[in-house]
């Protein structure tokens, strides 16, 4: 919960599934698992993993982080109004962020980063970005500026909807 909203992270759902399967949460393992889940359960499979969290939320507004495909958006539309915010940054900026973040599954080499990028492009992230209701360029923002900007947009949407 943050600023009065439930925050659900799709990547955390994949990490939880990896844990259930006793897989080490490395980038290659999580990438392979994500593709396997989509192949077996459809392109919206990762969104399906967060449905229980959506259903259990007592809040009217849920922020879902990490959408990668239009099929995931369609799954989420079964549970309410969906507004899409694309946060974009240059390749070098994103690589720097991921390297600094320091999660076990974050790419530490340019090669691993490019593999991750190509995997996400392959599942349709570019199409989801193209459908976004709003975009933020995150090349020169601090983390706090990004959060502030993001929640201003969300609050604007809330005023539109209500």
Outline where the language-model segments fall.
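A conserved segment at the C-terminal end of the G1
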Residues: 1-5
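Well-ordered beta-strand positions
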Residues: 6, 83, 133-134
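ATP-dependent small-molecule kinase phosphotransfer cores
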Residues: 6-63, 67-74, 110-112
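Conserved nucleotide-binding/hydrolysis micro-motifs of P-loop NTPases
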Residues: 13, 89-94, 141-142
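Short, charged, surface-exposed secondary-structure boundary motifs
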Residues: 17-21, 93-99, 145-148
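A glycine- and Lys/Arg-enriched "phosphate-lid" helix/loop adjacent to the NTP-binding pocket
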Residues: 27-32, 75-127
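Small-molecule kinase domains that catalyze NTP-dependent phosphoryl transfer to phosphate-bearing small molecules
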Residues: 44, 100-156, 160-161
